[in-house]
């Protein structure tokens, strides 16, 4: 097969590992810079062009769309869909997961556990908003933030009011979320492919920081997840409509809670922590799905 990897960063560990996984299974892997694609949108033969050439002959696409280019990246993925190319994560699902508010509403609709979350537009709603999530301490998140950036822990009600007022004054969209103290600055990252959790790790934030993101200096360690956590991770991915995703879970006194579903999860951290390849299952899944499409067999994830 000819498999395209949509990524702005060809030298990134994640990109190189996907290339290696494709090639090790006898496929041709082509890294395509998402932002260098341009599209011919018509009703006869929609196409994508790249560096002066039309992109043709692709059997599948693995989207690795960076959060900063979600709008354009989803347009490119959507164009491949219109061309009949199989995509590991479709454009609608990527867009769903990138909109934190919409993602939480989808999880809520499916009855999947998550931290209590508030969303408001007017400064005069702040006191009730704070009470809604259980009071301080609480977490305030920018909707556009990624990798722990734009996430603030407000220790007191006064601090929470000040931070929320400041963000709303800047016309920023924010979520106000209950703080799960018992998680102690850690979470569980589950890497899901299809209907399977192929790897999982515990991430612990640096001392004094409640954020567990590895990009912010957190560390990872192997962990055995429970059957409930496994089922919840898979259910969260299905709620988004994704196939390949990273699911962040907090362990709380009332059971596991979904923090986030990431459509382009980091690969380096979880592979180096667990020693498990997460890229090979991605390629294996693509092989099965493309073969099923070609033979018109029922597709079983």
Curated annotation (Swiss-Prot):
An example Gene Ontology biological process: protein modification process
Essential cofactor(s): Mg(2+); Mn(2+)
Family to which this protein belongs: Belongs to the RimK family.
Record carries keyword Manganese: yes
Keywords from the named record: ATP-binding, Ligase, Magnesium, Manganese, Metal-binding, Nucleotide-binding, Protein biosynthesis
Residues that coordinate or bind Mg(2+) 2: 260, 262
Name of the protein: Probable alpha-L-glutamate ligase 1
GO cellular-component term (any): cytoplasm
Domain ATP-grasp: 104-287
Lineage: Bacteria, Pseudomonadati, Pseudomonadota, Gammaproteobacteria, Alteromonadales
EC assignment: 6.3.2.-
One GO MF term attached to the UniProt entry: ribosomal S6-glutamic acid ligase activity
Metal-binding found in the keyword field: yes
Organism listed in the record: Shewanella sp. (strain W3-18-1)
Annotated HAMAP family: RimK
Uppermost EC category: ligase
């Amino acid at each position: 097969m000819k498999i395209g990897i949509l990524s702005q960063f060809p030298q990134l560990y994640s990109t190189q590992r996907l290339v290696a996984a494709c090639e090790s299974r006898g496929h041709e892997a082509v890294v395509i810079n998402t932002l260098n694609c341009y599209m011919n949108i018509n009703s006869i033969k929609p196409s994508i062009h790249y560096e002066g050439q039309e992109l043709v002959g692709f059997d599948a696409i693995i989207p690795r769309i960076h959060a900063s280019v979600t709008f354009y990246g989803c347009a490119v993925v959507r164009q491949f869909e219109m061309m009949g190319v199989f995509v590991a994560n479709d454009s609608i699902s990527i867009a769903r997961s990138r909109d934190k508010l919409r993602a939480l509403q989808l999880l809520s609709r499916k009855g999947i556990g998550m931290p209590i979350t508030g969303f408001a537009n007017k400064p005069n709603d702040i006191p009730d908003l704070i009470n809604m999530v259980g009071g301080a301490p609480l977490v305030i998140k920018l909707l556009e933030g990624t990798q722990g950036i734009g996430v603030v822990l407000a220790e007191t009600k006064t601090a929470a009011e000040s931070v929320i007022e400041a963000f709303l004054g800047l016309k920023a969209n924010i979520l106000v979320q209950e703080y799960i103290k018992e998680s102690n600055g850690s979470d569980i990252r589950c890497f899901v492919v299809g209907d399977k959790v192929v790897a999982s790790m515990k991430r612990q934030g640096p001392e004094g920081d409640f954020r567990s993101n590895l990009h912010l200096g957190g560390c990872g360690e192997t962990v055995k997840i429970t059957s409930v956590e496994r089922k919840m991770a898979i259910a969260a991915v299905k709620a988004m409509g994704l196939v390949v995703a990273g699911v962040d879970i907090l362990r709380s006194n009332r059971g596991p809670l979904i923090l986030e579903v990431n459509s382009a999860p980091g690969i380096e951290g979880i592979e180096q922590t667990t020693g498990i390849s997460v890229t090979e299952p991605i390629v294996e899944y693509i092989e099965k799905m493309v073969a099923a499409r070609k033979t018109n067999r029922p597709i079983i994830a």
